[in-house]
């Protein structure tokens, strides 16, 4: 990796062939007057620079975000040339701003400015931008506390396939096929049984699950479905939306399995993953723990107050990230 970066800095085209880096140095070091020690020194300097980026917690997260966003390491190194560490951080932060909101460093970033842009973000085409905002929210949350030594697990984030998940399912997520309906009801039934809730509802769910396939029609499913939504207070479709304040990052496997589950079932699953040591992004965990609502009344419901609290924290954290001096603290 190090030799590849040095060779590319010398002008080698990336991805030419699997031996391109070897051939580059072989040709360069066999030239008359080649300075092998100077070449080795350039490799060591690169290693020291990358090590500094890793050790410095703020650089680690800034560089990590930009590399995830597709930035070239050598281009980031070029930003550091002739710059103090403080100036380098500012340049990196400007790059993050450009990637996230498509504006230059001279933009007047106020809390209202952030709010206007986040309010306009909706689930759909261009989901990579939403991933970027939610990833940055996690990184900025970690960075705001200078005393914390927590680091975002970029390795886990890179190796797993990460999806955008609705905190509260939207109306079109109603399970359609019988298999999906059974799985959806079984998850609700398991939650109700573990929480010792809704005995009558449990019985109705079990009755539908036991129906012969010919009798398990949509007409039979819909009344049970509506009763489950009513129990979990998710029968008001207007409360759920595709805005970013109803979205979090979740691993692909969990998202595909639980995408249309009620909030309480999703919450139980996410907290189970966290307890088992499976990587769950901090802010996803905070959302399902309802950390962004100062007055938590019902942990198994996702309410308008929860959404509004999430919105305010997201705005505040990103505003602080782009304007706060704590990034240098």
Where are the regions that the model predicts?
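Flexible coil/loop and intrinsically disordered segments
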Residues: 1-329
């Amino acid at each position: 990796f190090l030799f590849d970066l040095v060779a590319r800095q010398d002008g080698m085209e990336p991805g030419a062939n699997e031996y391109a880096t070897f051939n580059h140095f072989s040709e360069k070091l066999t030239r008359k007057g080649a300075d092998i020690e100077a070449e080795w020194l350039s490799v060591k300097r690169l290693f020291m620079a990358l090590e500094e980026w890793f050790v410095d917690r703020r650089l680690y997260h800034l560089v990590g975000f930009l590399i995830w966003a597709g930035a070239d390491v050598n281009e980031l190194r070029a930003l550091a040339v002739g710059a103090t560490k403080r100036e380098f951080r500012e340049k990196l932060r400007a790059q993050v701003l450009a990637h996230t909101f498509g504006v230059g460093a001279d933009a007047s970033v106020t809390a209202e400015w952030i709010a206007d842009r986040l309010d306009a973000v909706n689930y759909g085409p261009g989901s990579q931008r939403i991933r970027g905002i939610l990833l940055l929210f996690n990184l900025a949350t970690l960075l705001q506390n200078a005393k914390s030594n927590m680091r975002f697990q970029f390795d886990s984030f890179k190796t797993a396939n990460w999806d955008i998940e609705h905190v509260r399912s939207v109306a079109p997520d109603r399970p359609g096929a019988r298999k999906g309906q059974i799985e959806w009801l079984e998850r609700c039934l398991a939650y109700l049984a573990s929480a010792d809730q809704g005995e009558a509802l449990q019985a109705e769910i079990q009755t539908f699950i036991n129906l012969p396939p010919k009798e398990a029609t949509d007409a039979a499913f819909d009344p049970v479905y509506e009763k489950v939504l009513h129990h979990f207070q998710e029968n008001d479709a207007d409360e759920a939306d595709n805005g970013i304040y109803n979205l979090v990052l979740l691993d692909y496997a969990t998202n595909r399995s639980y995408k249309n589950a009620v909030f309480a079932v999703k919450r139980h699953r996410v907290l189970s993953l966290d307890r088992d040591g499976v990587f769950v992004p901090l802010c996803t965990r905070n959302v399902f723990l309802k950390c962004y609502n100062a007055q938590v009344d019902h942990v198994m419901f996702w309410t308008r107050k929860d959404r509004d609290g999430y919105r305010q924290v997201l705005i505040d954290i990103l505003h602080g990230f782009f304007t706060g001096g704590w990034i240098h603290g």
